[in-house]
Amino acid sequence: DCEQHTDCSAASGPVYCCQDSDCCGGVDYICTNYGQCVRHF
């Protein structure tokens, strides 16, 4: 179970994501299968 979500207010940036909507930056970012947000082009 994934309970850690991205904290968009953290200066260090995203922590963990469970789904794409957890990512900061909108549709430009996706949640990878290892729980980090990455930008896709």
UniProtKB/Swiss-Prot annotation:
Any GO CC annotation of this UniProt entry: extracellular region
Positions in coiled-coil regions: none
Subcellular locations according to the entry: Secreted
GO molecular function, one term: toxin activity
Record keywords, A-Z: Disulfide bond, Secreted, Toxin
Organs and tissues of expression: Expressed by the venom duct.
Tagged with keyword Glycoprotein: no
Source species, domain of life: Eukaryota
Disulphide-bonded residues: none
Cleaved signal peptide residues: none
PTM summary: Contains 4 disulfide bonds.
The keyword Disulfide bond is annotated on this UniProt entry: yes
Entry function: Does not elicit any observable symptomatology in C.elegans.
Notes concerning its domains: The cysteine framework is XI (C-C-CC-CC-C-C).
The protein's name: Augerpeptide-s11a
